[in-house]
């Protein structure tokens, strides 16, 4: 199986690569469209800022290319947010794969800190990504923006408000949390993605 990780100006690519290596998978980290198109699975990771990253994706033509991929694609954190229609982070149009917007957390109480950083459980598991997953397992989040619960929600969690922890539409899967940093539970999610 050929697994490709999209290389662009965003962080956490190395941690995704390490997580795949722990599962015995040698991924190709590339921005080469032909290599990405030929891969069996594509991972779209990201830690960064939406406006700058979308500008980079548009300049390289990756914005149109990612939407045309037909194999299973997994967006992680910023990767998930960029798959949405619009982000309040920089008020930027995104890829529009998921017809929903990305909003900024608005804390209502002093003890509600932004960014949402740390471990949280997820529920309403409506995707094969979560095969063998139980409600009491924790995954790791680091983000200041969220995607509201919608028809594309494959899992949800609650921090300040309920929001989408994962999305799914056709061949596109996405997690707001970092499976590559979520221990055994995250490893299982990556393994499930690779088995789709």
UniProtKB/Swiss-Prot annotation:
Family matches, as PROSITE patterns: GATASE_TYPE_1
Subcellular location: Cytoplasm
Primary subcellular site in the record, as a coarse category: cytoplasm
SUPFAM superfamilies: Class I glutamine amidotransferase-like
GO molecular function annotations of the record: glutaminase activity; imidazoleglycerol-phosphate synthase activity; lyase activity
Domain of life of the source: Bacteria
Protein name, as recorded: Imidazole glycerol phosphate synthase subunit HisH
Organism expressing this protein natively: Bacteroides fragilis (strain YCH46)
Lineage: Bacteria, Pseudomonadati, Bacteroidota, Bacteroidia, Bacteroidales
């Amino acid at each position: 199986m050929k697994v490709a990780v999209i290389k662009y100006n965003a962080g956490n690519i190395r941690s995704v690569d390490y997580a795949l290596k722990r599962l015995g998978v040698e991924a190709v980290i590339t921005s080469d469209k032909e290599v990405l198109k030929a891969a069996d699975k594509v991972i779209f990771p990201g830690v960064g800022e939406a406006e700058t990253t979308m500008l980079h994706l548009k300049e390289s033509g990756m914005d149109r290319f990612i939407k045309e991929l037909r194999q299973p694609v997994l967006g992680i954190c910023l990767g998930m947010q960029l798959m949405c229609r619009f982000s309040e982070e920089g008020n930027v149009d995104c890829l529009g794969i998921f017809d929903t917007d990305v909003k900024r957390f608005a804390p209502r109480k002093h003890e509600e800190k932004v960014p949402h950083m740390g471990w949280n459980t997820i529920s309403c598991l409506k995707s094969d990504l979560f095969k063998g997953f139980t409600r009491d397992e924790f995954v790791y989040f680091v983000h200041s923006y969220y995607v509201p619960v919608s028809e594309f929600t494959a899992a949800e969690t609650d921090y300040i408000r309920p929001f989408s922890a994962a999305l799914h539409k056709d061949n596109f899967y996405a997690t707001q949390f970092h499976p590559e940093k979520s221990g055994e539970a995250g490893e299982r999610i990556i393994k499930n993605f690779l088995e789709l």
